[in-house]
């Protein structure tokens, strides 16, 4: 996969549409394109507060190590964040399996975050600077 930069609004809209959510600016985005230059997914970063930034991501295929390193480099090296947060619907079991495999830790369940039904609760995960450095930057 090839990484695409400089098309934040287009990528954020594509990710939001794929996930059925609206992503509000300000944000920065990295797109994932296939060999034919078609954007197949993306990572959108928003709600930056100096210490934390949130990740909204859509990737129809497996997430590659190169992609994870690009995300970790942006968040922990360029922005110098202490943590990266990711929320997913309780019903999104693939994300809940993948996030811990790449170093995210469960933090909380957020009741009725996406809607009334229990399947619309959110699950909050965090990747901290120490884990990111050990697994993705220095490892």
PLM feature spans:
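Short amphipathic alpha-helix that is part of the acyltransferase structural core
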Residues: 1-21
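A short helix-loop-beta-strand connector motif used in the catalytic cores of GNAT acetyltransferases and
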Residues: 20-34
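Conserved beta-strand in the GNAT
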Residues: 37-46
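Conserved acetyl-CoA binding element of GNAT-fold acetyltransferases
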Residues: 48-61, 87
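Conserved GNAT acetyl-CoA-binding A-motif
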Residues: 77-88
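Conserved beta-strand-loop-alpha-helix junction that forms the acyl-donor binding cleft
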Residues: 86-96
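Conserved active-site tyrosine of GNAT-family acetyltransferases
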Residues: 98-99, 104
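Conserved catalytic-core motifs of GNAT/GCN5-like acyltransferases
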Residues: 105-122
